[in-house]
């Protein structure tokens, strides 16, 4: 019986963390779910910057309220707290925080810190036990989590076509801190140039049918003045992203691949951005009925014609071999081996890019 139960619950654990939420309140059209996890995590690596304790926890809630028969309000917040630092250090941050309205088949609109629409497709390969999803990053234009997202989403194409979803998104400018020497581009939530963005727009479309999925996404963002100084490579007026992906998720098999081409949008360590980058991620997983889920993946990000003495360089390149074992819906353990294929050379040293292998061991409690 335990084997059958695990075969049903494990796929549910692989989607958004809130899928495993604990219901706190559900009455009179108002619902509140609490979710979270604690990951006792340790890295083993020759790179002393990452070797050691990486323990963290995440906590969040999802709420909704029935305004009318046709209108529903909703909100979500998620926070991460590092458990590997001293008590007098403030190593915590908000991952997402947004609120919105859903108008039945017409669609939903929300605003806040959220995921960019490019992640609607690239998330298909961001399923590894620990690593993965690092040909892009957070606060990286519209490629993953970011601030100031206004998002319209439509599911099942106005209720007419099952599995056909699309989204349109706008991101407001997140620029310089005050007092940084710039006369323009200052915003109330300023940050360093590598995590800034100008006004941006994007869209995505995905179609799922009987386990098969196909999707595409594009985004185009203005770059800030601080991003176009001589301090960084990859100057340009706009940061653009073009993404396509495929997936298969059925019969205990999960296969996914995505290819993304970017212009002035893929970060090159601490050096800046690639004028052009070609990013590829592919993953294969199989879910055994007794709770074991092995995983194999390949990820590569190649920068083209980088400039400043660099030509074409691999920004990221590794094979990932891992496995997760689910004791039940609340408890799991995993091992993830990142086999780094990058060479230690002048480029990786200048950019501060890690070239060492990493083994991650984790024990997770989630609710």
Curated annotation (Swiss-Prot):
What subcellular locations does the record give? Cell outer membrane
Which terms are listed as keywords in the entry?
Cell outer membrane, Ion transport, Magnesium, Membrane, Metal-binding, Porin, Signal, Stress response, Transmembrane, Transmembrane beta strand, Transport
Q: Which segment of the chain is annotated as a signal peptide? A: 1-21
What further note is attached to this protein's record?
Binds 1 Mg(2+) per subunit; could be Ca(2+) in vivo.
List, in alphabetical order, the Gene Ontology terms for molecular function in this entry: identical protein binding; metal ion binding; porin activity; virus receptor activity
Q: Which GO terms describe its cellular component?
A: cell outer membrane; pore complex
Positions on the Extracellular side per record topology: 43-53, 85-91, 116-141, 172-200, 220-241, 261-269, 300-318, 339-358
GO BP, one annotated term: intermembrane phospholipid transfer
- Where does the sequence pass through the membrane? 34-42, 54-63, 74-84, 92-101, 107-115, 142-154, 164-171, 201-207, 212-219, 242-248, 253-260, 270-286, 292-299, 319-326, 331-338, 359-366
**What does this gene product do?**
Forms pores that allow passive diffusion of small molecules across the outer membrane.
Name the family the entry cites: Belongs to the Gram-negative porin family.
Tell what the record comments on domains. Answer: Loop L3 (residues 116-133) extends along the inner side of the beta barrel wall and may constrict the pore mid-length.
Where, by residue number, does Mg(2+) bind? 340, 342, 355
The membrane-topology field of this record reads:
Multi-pass membrane protein
Identification of the protein by name = Outer membrane porin C
Q: Which NCBIfam families does the protein's record reference?
A: PRK10554.1
Question: Subunit comment for this entry?
Answer: Homotrimer. Forms mixed heterotrimers with OmpF and with PhoE; other mixed heterotrimers are also probable.
Give residue spans on the Periplasmic membrane side. Answer: 22-33, 64-73, 102-106, 155-163, 208-211, 249-252, 287-291, 327-330, 367
Q: What happens when the gene is disrupted?
A: Deletion of both ompC and ompF confers resistance to colicin E5 and to the toxic activity of CdiA-EC536.
């Amino acid at each position: 019986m335990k084997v059958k139960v695990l075969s049903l619950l494990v796929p549910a654990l692989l989607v958004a963390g809130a899928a495993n939420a604990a219901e706190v309140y559900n009455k009179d059209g108002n619902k509140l779910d609490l979710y979270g996890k604690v990951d006792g995590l340790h890295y083993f690596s020759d790179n002393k910057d990452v070797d050691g304790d990486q323990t963290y926890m995440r906590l969040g809630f999802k709420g909704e309220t029935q305004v009318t028969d046709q209108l529903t309000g909703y909100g979500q917040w998620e926070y991460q707290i590092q458990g590997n630092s001293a008590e007098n250090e403030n190593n915590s941050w908000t991952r997402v925080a947004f609120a919105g309205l859903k108008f039945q088949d017409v669609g939903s609109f929300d605003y806040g810190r959220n995921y960019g629409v490019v992640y609607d497709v690239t998330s298909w390969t961001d399923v590894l036990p620990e690593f993965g999803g690092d040909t892009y990053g957070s606060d990286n234009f519209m490629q993953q989590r970011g601030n100031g997202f206004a998002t319209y989403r439509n599911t099942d194409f106005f209720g007419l076509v099952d599995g056909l979803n699309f989204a349109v998104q706008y991101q407001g400018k997140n620029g310089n801190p005050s007092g940084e020497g710039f006369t323009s581009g200052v915003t109330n939530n300023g940050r360093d140039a590598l995590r800034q963005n100008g006004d941006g727009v994007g869209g995505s479309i995905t179609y799922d049918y009987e386990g098969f999925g196909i999707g595409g996404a594009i985004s185009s963002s203005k770059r800030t003045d601080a991003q176009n100084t001589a301090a960084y490579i990859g100057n340009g007026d706009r940061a653009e992203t073009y993404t396509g992906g495929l997936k298969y998720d059925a019969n205990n098999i999960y296969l996914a691949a995505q290819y993304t081409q970017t212009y002035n949008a893929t970060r090159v360590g601490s050096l800046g951005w690639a004028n052009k980058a070609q990013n590829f991620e592919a993953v294969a997983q199989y879910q055994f009925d007794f709770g074991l889920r092995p995983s194999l993946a390949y990820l590569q990000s190649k920068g083209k014609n980088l400039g400043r003495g660099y030509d074409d360089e691999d920004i990221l390149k590794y094979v990932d071999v891992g496995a997760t074992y689910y004791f039940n819906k609340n408890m799991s353990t995993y091992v993830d081996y990142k086999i780094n294929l990058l060479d230690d050379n002048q480029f990786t040293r200048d950019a501060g890019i890690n070239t060492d292998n990493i083994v991650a061991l984790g024990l997770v409690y989630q609710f």
